Structure formats: structure tokens, C-alpha cells
Amino acid sequence: MNSKIKVDKFVIVAFLLCMVCTMAMQAKAYDNFKVSVYVRAYEVDKMKDIHWLDSTWNVISQQLEVDKIYLETHRDLLIVDDATLEQAKKFFHDRGIETAGGITYTINEANSFETFCYSNPEHREMVRKIAEHTAKHFDEFILDDFFFTSCKSDIEIKAKGAQSWTEYRLKLMTEAGRDLVLKPAKKVNPRVKVIIKYPNWYDHFQGLGFNLEEGPQLFDGVWTGTETRDPAGNQHLQNYLSYNIIRYFDNRRPGYNGGGWVDSGGLKLGMDRYAEQLHLTMLAKAPEIILFAYNQLLGVKLSPRFRTPWQGMGTSFNYDEMTAPIRQKDGTSIEPTTMARIADVVLKQTDKLIGKLVNPIGIKSYKPFHVAGDDFLQNYLGMIGLPMDIRPVFPKDQQVV
């Protein structure tokens, strides 16, 4: 009897220790949202070398607390093999990090963002196989915002017929999403959740086939590109878009907008331009932020050139404080080396504020599907201090629209 009691006690103690370890591994780094990192297929492919994976992850994780990793399976015709994907998944799971998949449907991004031709039978077969390959490894994956087509091959010209390019591409990409991505993926893995990321060009979605009328209802969720980068760049995006476009997709299909997405674009304006994009994304109450990408968080080194002239004048972004030594949990300190440190400090600042805020409100602004003209008007209104709230359906219950 005594031996049985001892065994039972041992089992209980072991169980409790496992529970404590699990809770510790699953402890949230942030109270009000998740922070995730997207890894391009180029870097995922390098993760076949476990030493490279471990050493690079140490650089990032010592500076930035991460809840989730998106492992891309395809980009520019590079398909990451099964063994590498499983090794990478296990590596992150062992460290308490969630994993999901990602796909970028490009043939050659460097060649003017060359995409697939979705009426070409060979291309269609590749698109289908990539979706199946990804669904085999993940219960969730996201399509990076290259799920569009700019192809004008002979096949596409013939298939278009008398339609305009916009009409043709809207129908084509809706069909491709349904028949080449969703159906094949769910046949391989009925549990899989497929999310489409929409880019930051909301006034021009329709021209290359992003169908805002049907797409958000077709996919299991949407993601929002909140990258505003340099306002003087070729897109001429105003800073307010990082907030405004989150609200637009929240209103398009409430409860299905997974979050925002920011990269390192615009750093020539200073590191606080990056910080502002993070702040504005989260102030829109995004439930998750994806930081693009692993290679940038690893490779963009902290430098005095990112310190703007107005530092030291009482601004909320203090470059010197953010680049000070980081105290680790074991009491040691390390010198921050990359932009991962900036993301960590900024997001933790924002996290403290977000919990005190209610849901955003603003002046309702009606934007019908597939319209052109008055490019990004709502962003300009936001920049002069008017709180905007874009709606895809006319808000009949409002006195002011």
C-alpha cells in the first residue's frame, strides 16, 4: 500500500511539474495582442542547418519576445522540403512558439513582382501543389499579398476576351482562390485555416484581381498590410493608413481580420518611422502584428543613421534608451544589435496603452467595392485630424457620412 501511495505521489508531482513547465512556455509576452514573425522561404530553407537556425534565433529572441512564427513554404519557385519544415516547426514548438505556414505566389519577385498566370494550366497545377504541400504541414497558413496577377500572356489575353483586365482578373483570382488554394488545401487537411493578406493599396485592389467583395467571405480570414514606409515613396501613402486600413477590414467582415503587417521599409527616415507604423497598427486594436521578416529582424543592424535630429526633444520614441543594454532574465546584460530590439520596446510600450482603450470610433466614410478616383482620400482626412472609419456598405443609420 505504501509503495502505491509513493507511486501515486510521484505521478502527481510529475504531472504538476509538467503543467508548470507548459504554462511557463505558453506564458504570453504581451497582454493585448500577439507578436509574430514571418520567415521567407529563403530563410526557412536555411533552417535545414540546425546550427544556423539556433544561432540566428538567439540573435532575434534575445531582443524581441515572439509569440508565433509563420514559416513560408514557397517563394519565387523555391519550395521548402518536408524535412526542413518539420525540423523548423519542432524547433519553435520546443521553445513554446506557435507555428503557422505562409505562401508567396511569385515566380520571380525581383522581376517586377512576376506572378503566376492563373489561366495557364501548368501554372495552375503548381499553385495547387503548393497549397497542398503547405496544408500537409500546417493547420493555418497565410497568403502573402502577392496573390494577384499582372500576367498578360497570350493565354491570358485569349481567356480575357472582351472583358476589361479588371473584370477578368477579379473573376479569375476569385476562382483561383477557391479552386486552386482553398479546396485542395482543405482536401489534404480539413482543419486548415487559409488567410489572405491584402496589401496597403486599398484604392487599387481590383486592378490586379483582389476582390474585396467576395474574397473576405471566401477565405477563412483576412490580414491587413499596414506598411506605410516612406510617404514620399512611389506609393505616396500617408502615415494614417497604418491605422485606417485595419479599421476598413474590420468593417468589411467583423471578427475575421487577423491583424496588421509591417516591414522595415522607410528606415531612411529614421527608426521612429518604423515605430510609428507599429504604434498606429496596434492603436486600431489589431489582435496580432506580423513583423516582416526574419531576415530583416536579423540583418538590419542598429546604426546612428537611424537616430533622427529631433531625438532628445521629449518625443515618445527615444532611440538612445531603446538601444541601451538589455537585461536578461538571468541577470546578465547584452548589447542590442538589430531592429528586433526596436520592435520589442515599441510594442511593449503600446501594449501598456492598448489595455486602457475601448474600440476605435470615427466619422463613417462610404467606399464602395471596386471604385477608383480620389485616391486615399480618407488617409489625407485622417492626417489633418479627422478620425476616419471606412465602410464598404453605406451606413444608413448615421446622421453624418
Map each language-model feature to its residues.
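Bacterial N-terminal signal peptides that target proteins for export
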Residues: 2-13
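Surface-exposed amphipathic alpha-helices with a cationic face
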Residues: 31, 86-100, 177-192, 246-257
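Bacterial Sec-dependent signal peptides at the C-terminal "C-region" and cleavage site
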Residues: 21-31
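Active-site-adjacent "subsite" loops/lids of carbohydrate-active enzymes
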Residues: 30-54, 85-93, 98-139, 145, ...
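Short, acidic/polar
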Residues: 45-63, 120-134, 204-215, 270-281
